[in-house]
Amino acid sequence: MARSQASTSTAKGAGFTLHTERLGPLPLINHFIERLGLHDTLSRHVASDARCAVSHASALGVLLRSIIVEREPIYRQQETVHGFADGMFGIGERDMALLSDDRLGRALDRLFDADRTALLTELVLSVGQRFGVRFDEFHNDSTT
């Protein structure tokens, strides 16, 4: 349910207000993203400067969650984020207002320029350590 469509109703005589927000699968997705330490890893490998209103790591986190949940084009990310409860996409209400396709594009440019090999290696090792995945017979075929 979109934020603009969120229902608010008052129970008869009780004085209670019911406020409904859309969560979808994001609490579960956020659990695994946090357990992986993905935001910290992205922050280390895809650095933002002080001029960025929304860090590149946060913008990339929004895109990742969007791909998993909604698969909307980049130009519709702000609408997608506003359709869910505050914080579900890893950014607060203030940052949601600052999200734009230009800002997301700059984050993707920085990701392209980053040392993606080191980033992916750190993420794979993080999965192994935090989820108990054994790599005894793991072969990374990077030729394809």
Outline where the language-model segments fall:
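Dynamic "connector" segments at or just before major functional cores
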Residues: M1-T144
